[in-house]
């Protein structure tokens, strides 16, 4: 791999997009701080205050950024993580997992090749949220028998 390609690969691996609604605003700020300190380039797609907003708008912004190739992975935060997960999974090519434990966050990447982690600002505190993000971002897709299953999931996108 040439130097430029290797540098771009490393840069993209440490880059992610993040978005939230009002229910996830405080947790999003904690995640950005933690991940930036951990060496990630974090692109914040909003929301920008704890004022009430509609979560599908921010899920859409993040999923469109991923599908454009702006970053390989994303994190969405709302009150429970559920609404963001539902909205994100409406997008072709997105495999979003809603997690409140580190094992599920890790396995979402390892077995399902998830590209979006969703969590709830009213479900997990900042410490747990940061641990979820670390587990998700440090895990790698295992491939093998799981690759076949991800191909099946991708085929469902095409069937729509």
Where are these regions (language model features)?
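Short hydrophobic/aromatic-enriched beta-strand-loop microsegments
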Residues: 41, 94-101
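Helix-adjacent hinge/juxtasegments
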Residues: 58-97
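A short beta-strand-loop structural module common to alpha/beta enzyme folds
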Residues: 41-52
């Amino acid at each position: 791999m040439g130097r430029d390609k290797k540098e771009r690969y490393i840069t993209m691996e440490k880059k992610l997009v993040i978005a939230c609604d009002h229910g996830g605003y405080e947790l999003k700020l904690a995640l950005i701080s933690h991940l930036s300190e951990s060496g990630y380039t974090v692109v914040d797609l909003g929301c920008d205050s704890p004022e009430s907003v509609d979560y599908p708008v921010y899920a859409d912004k993040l999923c469109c950024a991923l599908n454009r190739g702006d970053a390989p992975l994303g994190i969405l935060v709302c009150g429970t993580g559920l609404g963001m997960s539902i909205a994100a999974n409406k997008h072709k090519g997105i495999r979003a997992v809603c997690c409140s434990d580190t094992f599920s966050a890790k396995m979402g990447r390892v077995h399902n090749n998830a590209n979006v982690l969703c969590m709830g600002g009213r479900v997990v505190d900042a410490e747990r949220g940061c641990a979820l993000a670390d587990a998700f971002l440090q895990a790698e897709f295992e491939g093998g028998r799981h690759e076949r299953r991800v191909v099946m999931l991708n085929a469902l996108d095409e069937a729509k």
